[in-house]
Amino acid sequence: MKVNLQTEFKQTQIQQVLDDLDRELIGLQAVKTRIREIAALLLVDRLRQKLGLSSSNPGLHMSFTGSPGTGKTTVATKMADILYRLGYIKKGHLITVTRDDLVGQYIGHTAPKTKQVLKNAMGGVLFIDEAYYLYRPDNERDYGAEAIEILLQVMENQRDDLVIIFAGYKEKMDRFYASNPGLSSRVANHVNFPDYTPEELLMIGKIMLQEQQYQFTPEAEEVFLQYIQRRMQQPHFANARSVRNALDRARLRQANRIFATPGQNLTKYDLVTIQAEDILKCRLFQ
């Protein structure tokens, strides 16, 4: 008996998901390569099953590390789709949660909360953002450890029904795993999301504007790149998320600039164009 790799690959339609990932995310080549590697492993494992070869279910739980706004949630959504198309999960949906969704504030509250989240996520992927906040060793009365114990049981006993992705800053996630070796041993796939370069963030910003039918003037584009370079040096920078916030404020200033001269006849160009002054009025340039 033989199986045709190309036929199997086409039937799963995972190439469409990988193409979407390439198109929707600027840069992140190492991340995209890692996702392709995981997809290849899962496809080959599926072929082994078809030929009756021994196939221990590959560890599917994952760790996504990196700063906010680097595409972790987007990639998690695509990963859920890949797992679904390959038959590793039954539904393919993604549930995103944080500590507050899992941990209660009093005795007996955490277990029901965590179990309800897990019930909702069954058949799909559970994405736990800033997972390290589940563990607070400095507080003996914290109930996060109870949530972790329940997660460990499900990761081991129901791994055919649910994939869990733990996400957050790399340094904090490393400490989280070091403090929870039982958890670390169950997470087979680690994917690191690097910060974007200023040029990549400019490209992301231009795409965001195009999606909303806006555009930069050439001067505004240069100024926005300068803005990004300055903003990256400031606290709480969140990559693409910070770019989106900056563009929202630029649109607000553009609207106020137009509104300040009510007598003029406006063209489509006037309404879609972000000028350099719409960016230069932000605090970073003052």
Swiss-Prot record:
ATP binds at residues 66-73. Its main location: plastid. Signal peptide: none annotated. It is found in: Plastid, Chloroplast. It comes from the Eukaryota. One of its GO terms (cellular component) is chloroplast. Keywords: ATP-binding, Chloroplast, Nucleotide-binding, Plastid. SMART domains: AAA (SM00382). InterPro entries: AAA+_ATPase, AAA_lid_6, ATPase_AAA_core, CbxX/CfqX_mono, CbxX/CfxQ, CbxX/CfxQ_RuBisCO_ESX, P-loop_NTPase. GO terms for molecular function: ATP binding; ATP hydrolysis activity. PANTHER family: AAA-TYPE ATPASE FAMILY PROTEIN / ANKYRIN REPEAT FAMILY PROTEIN, AAA-TYPE ATPASE FAMILY PROTEIN _ ANKYRIN REPEAT FAMILY PROTEIN. Necessary for the expression of RuBisCO. Belongs to the CbxX/CfxQ family. This is Protein CfxQ homolog. It comes from Cyanidium caldarium (Red alga). The gene is cfxQ.
